Amino acid sequence: MKKYRRALALVSCLSLCSLVWLPSWHVCCKESSSASTSYYSQDDNCAIGSEDTQFQKKNEREEPSNAELSGKSNSYLTISPEGNKIKDDYTVDVQDLETTKLSLPVVEALPTVDLHEESSSVVVGSETIENSSSSSTSERTPVSELDEVEKSGTLSIAKPGEVEQPEADCDAGEAPDADAPVEQPAFVSPPESLVGQHIENVSSSHGKEKVTKSEFESKVSVSEQDGGDPKSALNTSDTLKNESSDYTKPGETDPTSVTSPKDPEDIPTFDEWKKKVMEVEKEKSQSLHPSSNGGPHATKKVQKNRNNYASVECGAKILAANPEAKSTSAILIENMDLYMLNPCSTKIWFVIELCEPIQVKQFDIANYELFSSTPKDFLVSISDRYPTNKWIKLGTFHGRDERNVQSFPLDEQMYAKYVKMFIKYIKVELLSHFGSEHFCPLSLIRVFGTSMVEEYEEIADSQYQSERQELFDEDYDYPLDYNTVEDKSSKNLLGSATNAILNMVNIAANILGAKTEDLTEGNKSISENATATTEPKMTESTRVSTPVPSPEYVIKEVHTHDREPSTSDPPKESPIVQLVQEEEEEASPSTVTLLGSGEQEDESSSWFESETHILCSELTSICCISSFSEYIYKWCSVRIALYRQRSRTVSKGKDFVPPQPSLLLPVESVEVSVPQPPSGDVDSENMEREAETVDLDDLSSVHQGHLINHTVDTIELEPSYPQTLSQSLLLDVTPEMNSLSKVEGSESVKSEGGYIPSQLMTQESSVEFDDKTEKKTESFSSAEKLSVIYETSKVNEVMDNTVKEDILSTEVVTKFPETVVPPPMNTATVPEGESVETKPSIADTLKHTVTPVMDPSLPEVKEDEQSPEDALLRGLQRTATDFYAELQNSTDLGYGNGNLVHGSNQKESVFMRLNNRIKALEVNMSLSGRYLEELSQRYRKQMEEMQKAFNKTIVKLQNTSRIAEEQDQRQTEAIHLLQAQLTNMTQLVSNLSATVAELKREVSDRQSYLVMSLVLCVVLGLMLCMQRCRTTSQFDGDYISKLPKSNQYPSPKRCFSSYDDMNLKRRTSFPLIRSKSLQFTGKEVDPNDLYIVEPLKFSPEKKKKRCKYKTEKIETIKPADPLHPIANGDIKGRKPFTNQRDFSNMGEVYHSSYKGPPSEGSSETSSQSEESYFCGISACTSLCNGQTQKTKTEKRALKRRRSKVQDQGKLIKALIQTKSGSLPSLHDIIKGNKEITVGAFGVTAVSGHI
């Protein structure tokens, strides 16, 4: 506890001294640091994206290295008590206290940025460092912190920082705690400035991606989780830097936030939105900001105007060309094998329609074809419309006889009139050509310019740029040379004070020949604390060192810096240097990055040398601390190389330890030489000797293991290098891995670098230490830088240069503390002389070893990086090489001065970080507000659109429902109608069916009736036919043949006589057919008239019978009326027949041959013949059947009558012939000559009067 209190007291005194000692220097440091800080912030912004991407890769690599670092850190922690003793030995100067205070606020600014839990712990460590003056840091005992660190397995950066800070607090408990921690940050701040500068350069050169602070923090937290070692602390510190830069980037990207609203439908998350905005802003800022610088501005314009608007890809086309031209569109295609072919003898011209109206800035024309003539002079005309007769001649361009792309940029002054015109059509006319070939092909033509949109964006961006210029500059927009310029300005501000400090650094370097190791321990602890303060990196390094020793080292280191830069030389705290070594390597790449700007590195180196000589002599503690930090860094790099070389033997556990003890001795001597530090330093050195002796073994083993892990990685990168080289490369590789978790890599680098630098410091502890150490340091630092560059290249592969810059800066910061730590270890192990002797050998070895490492790392970097970042890295490497040569030519003090300037810049960079963080917070607030406004607007719009759509939908639904209801009603009505119609139809159909059934029944009945009637008719017809057949069958055919064939009718008499003979009772078979048509009226027909209808056929039997009884049956027909002769001879019956047999009464026509009554004396035969004749009359039947047999008297009377009538018969015959001449005669009737149809019955008859 006493040690802790002493250390705290020393630190507080140093901080007070730093504040009070040299205000002018403090101001200068602030300015330089601010410049570096601002530049660093810019680089951080650029580096954030790369770091974010690379952190993940490196975190994976760093996990093994973190374990190694944890082991190393444990060893460092054990060694740290000695450092604490040394710190106790060192008296705290007020100047140192002031310096620490100054650095403290810077450190506080760093921890202000909150990472994830692990990063937060790191931040806490840095904050405790910053607030080391406060009791919070002192409250936590280093032992408890160490325990926690040991428990954690991986030394989380925050915890080690906290541990170291409490130790410092305990030591400085007597003295103000704030001062001691502040001193450590102050010392650390210079490395941060270096780191910031390197990072800035790297970020500017390599910053391709930009990541939001939250994203970067998340990535950093992941990396920290992967390795909780001091490397993670370093990573967190870098993360803080990156965060500050990130905040700046959001501000820069503010104008681009408008881009996000372009997608109103898609509402991205804040991180996505911010990332997009930052990326857009980054592109714009990269193109716009360099405009302030002539060269970069041209580059910016080229970048902005690198759109070829005469390309087929964007829609350009050939509108017209000379008719001989072939494949005219080939000139718009980026294909070397395609070309427009024209004979040289023709007039070659063509018109191109560009993709869009642009302000023409440049023309490119090319002819790749061999054995052809290339264009020499060509006229270019422009127009805003086509076709046109007013082509504006832009000018005649003269080409070269080359078969490649020839560019013709337009001078804005000469073509100011045309450059501002927006044209879309270009006419090119080839006026002449080189050579005498037949063909003049043209392979390519390009037109570059600015479109209306780009011009508008430039104006808007320029306005926004003017508003946000500071923020952009701070973030990442400064060119690689920016830090150099700032450094120069800061250097100028430092002035003679810086030179005095540099001189003091030189003196300290001489002292460091013997005591550098002690100072190195103090510086190491201080740098570690500073690293933790600056970022978790410092915390990391502090954690690595033993809690108590590290505060002591910090106090000692701060005090030493305040007193003498030599006191804070690297040799002391090798354990911390190991942690710092990784950081140093990373930091060295950062430094290389700064150097990458070439001019910056060279100028800074020369300036540092001069200023270091001037200022270090006067302002040894403060300015030398900053310059000395770089100086320590170089020594650390040298010692790292030596340690790498020795790490092989160190793995065995022997070679590594002896050189460190030797280093410790020189540190003691240095501390003794220092007025205040000597006593405290001696004690602390003893402490450190013991602790370091033990820790060096552990550290050597751990360091070896860590190096082994690095070797594995390095084998891939540099398998050909020897183990030492591979170790150094591994350290470099480890920083890369650590760059993923920056803390881990930085810690391992610190420890390793710490050993080697301490050894180098021990070697240079002699009076020659200044020159030798400077040279060696320069060589080793350059080698280390090369390795760092290699690391950086790898880091660039894994991460963006921004991340590498942060890592490198962190490493540099850590390396300085590491350099401080190794001396105590060496002191404990070996006397000063031994340490010095060992150092030279180690330094030489390191030089040899590091030199190869440098070379290989450079080519590897070149191989690894092919991008502009690679070019930057190569430039940085060349710059580093030049810078290294300059450093060799110059003294180490000069380089230390450069580091000093960086340190001062770093201090200011811390303040600037705070400012940047504030601005970043403002930017974030503005972005958040803008994002919220955008979200609210989008939400409002979406809600309005949704509401409108909903209303429309409701209206449509209502309309649809109303239409549907109407349709339903109509359909319902139609259905009802259809149903009614259906019922009616059903009824109709049923009625029809019933009616049809009835009709069917009626028809069937009728049909049945008809059938029945037909049947009856048929039956009746058949019956009639049968009867007819029977009747006809009774007649005998002979009867007809027997009839007389005389043409004359028998006389009536004969007939009557024959009638007398007939048997009247016999019925005739054929009665006379009655016919109304043949009825004789009483007027016309007399009873005496006789109508013969048809001959009666009598069967022979009947004839015989009739003849037989003829005499007996013949009756005399007496007319009822007497016949009165008429004048014309007609005879009229007086009376109608009264007899029933009379014709009148009968009403029937009898067809028969009328014969007069037979004469009484006629024979029987004659009577028979007459009878036969008479029988032909239809009335015969009635006569025959109706007459009764007459008596003889009647027969006689009849005969007399017949005789009388015989004459009358003739008369009647004549009458009949005359009156009814149409009537056929009986003979005719018999013969069938004539037929008479009577009535419907078709009876043939003859009508006539009898």
UniProtKB/Swiss-Prot annotation:
The keyword Glycoprotein applies. Its main location: endoplasmic reticulum. It is found in: Rough endoplasmic reticulum membrane. Glycans are attached at residues 201, 235, 523, 924, 951. Residues 55-64, 206-218, 240-252, 271-286 have a biased composition (Basic and acidic residues). It is a single-pass type I membrane protein. Residues 55-75, 116-302, 527-547, 581-602, 742-769, 1148-1168 are annotated as: Disordered. Residues 164-177 have a biased composition (Acidic residues). Residues 283-452 form the SUN domain. Residues 1-19 form the signal peptide. The keyword Transmembrane helix applies. The modification Phosphoserine is found at residue 1077. Residues 120-144, 1159-1168 have a biased composition (Low complexity). One of its GO terms (cellular component) is rough endoplasmic reticulum. Disruption phenotype: Most mice die neonatally from respiratory distress (50% on a mixed C57BL6/CD1 background and 100% on an inbred C57BL6/129Ola background). Surviving mice fail to thrive and show significantly reduced body weight, skeletal deformities and spontaneous fractures. More than 80% die by postnatal day 10, and none survives to weaning. Keywords: Coiled coil, Developmental protein, Endoplasmic reticulum, Glycoprotein, Membrane, Osteogenesis, Phosphoprotein, Signal, Transmembrane, Transmembrane helix. Residues 905-1005 form a coiled coil. SUPFAM superfamilies: Galactose-binding domain-like. It comes from the Eukaryota. It holds the Pfam family Sad1_UNC. Gene3D superfamilies: Galactose-binding domain-like. GO terms for biological process: ossification; positive regulation of collagen biosynthetic process; positive regulation of osteoblast differentiation; regulation of bone remodeling. The chain crosses the membrane at residues 1007-1027. N-glycosylated. O-glycosylated. O-mannosylated by POMT1 and POMT2 and elongated by POMGNT1. Required for bone modeling during late embryogenesis. Regulates type I collagen synthesis in osteoblasts during their postnatal maturation. This is SUN domain-containing ossification factor. It comes from Mus musculus. The gene is Suco.
